[in-house]
Amino acid sequence: MVTSTSRDFAAEVQSGERFAFGENWSRFLTVLDEERIAEARVSLREMLGRDDLAGLSFLDVGSGSGLFSLAAAQLGAERVHSFDDDPSSVGCTLELKRRYASAGTRWEVARASALDADYVESLGRFDVVYSWGVLHHTGDMWAALANVTRAVGAGGRLFIAIYNDQGARSSIWRAIKRLYNTLPEPARLPLVLAVMMPREALTAAKSVVRGRPLDYVRGWTNYKGTRGMSRWHDLVDWVGGYPFEVAQPEQILDFLRPRGFELERMKTCGGGLGCNQFVFTRRPPA
């Protein structure tokens, strides 16, 4: 059954206003293995500063492939709720639940948007709210961030990753991403190659100059150590990912502190290209 919401989503993809993230995640599932899943668990443990999530509830906002919902479930989360606005991403998350979730796992999967304040409010409060690289693709990043903060319980944690603001460079990337989504399908791969290969060639050349040419090769072969991800699928996601918004770390801090959040951990991309990661704790009411 096609709902009005799914027709709107399909229309946005068709018109070039939105990247089909779920299709890229579907391809990622073909390379997903136990090693990548283990790396996803490691990344959650490291950023949250916990060995497990036993007894905690976990909300995955924009679940994408479903990998981190799965990781949370495997770390012992008492309850996992995943939602995504992209129907293909919902399908990916359901597929991972089917493949890997043990019997009795409390893991709900739904189709919804982080911009739907009523939906987010209806979910109640969670111990961990996770949204990695999602809110800046909603089309209204600050509204989406405001919505998801309401799902964090007192003393709970908010773990987000937001694209770093590079000023004029970010504007150029926004134009490239918009172009990707307006191109016919056969022209998209050539654009990815044209945009990213010069960067890759420069990285390879630096490895050669340092006398360590295999470092570049390992950057590809060992990439699964980066949150269990795939470098190629991340490149496609990067070039195509649209809508596209950015923020400086200070803007995120200034937005969340008045809403009762304290920064617990931050991992930036050094002012360059990529996402800044934040873990906040919600202060209990006085």
Labelled PLM ranges:
Residues 184-258:
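Substrate-binding/catalytic lobe of Class I Rossmann-like enzymes that use SAM or dcSAM, i.e.
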Residues 35-54:
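Conserved alpha-helix/loop element of class I SAM-dependent methyltransferases that forms part
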Residues 71-116:
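Class I SAM-dependent methyltransferase SAM/SAH-binding core
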Residues 1-36:
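N-terminal, positively charged/glycine-rich alpha-helical extensions of SAM-dependent methyltransferases
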Residues 142-154:
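A short glycine-rich, Lys/Arg-flanked "PGG" loop and its adjoining helix->strand segment in the class I
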Residues 56-62, 157-190:
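Conserved class I S-adenosyl-L-methionine
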Residues 119-128:
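A short acidic, Gly/Pro-enriched loop at the edge of an enzyme's catalytic core
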